[in-house]
Regions:
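Bacterial N-terminal signal peptides that target proteins for export
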Residues: 1-13
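Electrostatic cytochrome c docking/interface patches
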Residues: 170-195
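The canonical Cys-X-X-Cys-His
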Residues: 192-207, 233, 251-252, 267-271
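Gly/Gly-Pro-rich "capping" loops immediately C-terminal to redox-active cysteine motifs
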Residues: 205-238, 253
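Axial heme c-ligation environment in periplasmic c-type cytochrome domains
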Residues: 213-219, 239-288
Length: 289
């Protein structure tokens, strides 16, 4: 190859590398990845803070800090402007520690007494560590404001988030989550499936279905109903430290306002039912038994 050809060839090669490398490689700080329908947008923290629609908000009920706090934030609906979200889809938020929560489309766009915001931690104004933890809730934290914000489950206040993506509803995305279709319409396991997705699916998988990695699968290789008594499992879910304690323990306790006794019973009904439906999930398709 002649010297005159090397220059243009090298330039082309470097350009191709730059196009295929994720934006986060070149970013100087934390980034938030937003993906939907095959398109990916990577937002740099400083770029987000420079947006004209950034506002200052104050929470009255803050799940991470347990006390009112003021943040600079952008409305989640504004961040998702131009993104097509089907009526039955969810916005999946993934955190650094493997925590994953599914935000229903109707909740994201509620705007009637409930508004979701992405709070942004500025480099020159760092947030304090979360109580009992050594890190803050940043750099990105989803918080809710409005008269009805207290009705949003604590599991839908994810902090330290790294990505948001539009996905099918969990049961459609992972059919192996579903209860037996022949179950009676009023069988408690049916409602239990919904509660499980809202409360447990953030950390656990079921039949290897799910995106979370913070906790173990709850059906493979064994379902907890197969080695816990009913009373023991209820105690573990309500307050894990009342059953066992170890230094790396991560599962939180659940107050009655976050998980009612009725909801706890529905989760157990679902787990009991699923213990006879062991399979390995195939995303978007049939399960493998």
């Amino acid at each position: 190859m002649t010297a005159t050809m090397i220059g243009p060839a090298l330039t082309l090669a470097l350009s191709l590398v730059a196009l295929t490398m994720p934006t986060s490689v070149w970013a100087t700080g934390p980034t938030l990845t937003v993906s939907a329908d095959g398109s990916v947008h990577i937002f740099d923290r400083d770029a987000l803070l420079a947006r004209t629609d950034v506002v200052e908000i104050t929470t009255s009920r803050d799940v991470a800090y347990r006390t009112p706090r003021t943040y600079r934030a952008v409305a989640l609906a504004k961040l998702l402007e131009g993104v097509a979200i089907p009526p039955d889809a969810v916005v999946e938020a993934v955190a650094q520690d493997g925590f994953v929560t599914q935000l229903p489309r109707d909740l994201v766009y509620a705007n009637d007494g409930i508004v979701a915001y992405v709070a942004i931690e500025a480099a020159d104004r760092p947030w304090p560590p979360i109580p009992a933890k050594d890190k803050s809730a940043g750099a990105f934290y989803i918080v809710w404001l409005g008269d009805q914000a207290s009705s949003v489950p604590t599991m839908m206040w994810p902090y330290q988030i790294v990505s948001l993506s539009v996905q099918d509803a969990p049961a459609k995305r992972w059919p192996s989550l579903a209860v037996d279709p022949m179950l009676p319409a009023l069988h408690p396991a049916r409602d239990g499936q919904t509660v499980f997705v809202n409360k447990c699916f953030t950390c656990h998988t079921m039949n290897q279905a799910g995106s979370a990695s913070a906790g173990p699968d709850l059906n493979l290789p064994m379902n907890p109903t197969e080695y816990f008594t009913d009373a023991g499992l209820r105690a573990l879910i309500r307050d894990p430290r009342s059953v066992r304690v170890w230094p790396e323990q991560r599962m939180p306790s659940f107050a009655e306002e976050d998980l009612s006794d009725e909801e706890l019973g529905l989760i157990l009904a679902y787990l009991n039912h699923m213990s006879d439906r062991k399979s390995r999930a195939t995303e978007g398709g049939s399960s493998k038994r």
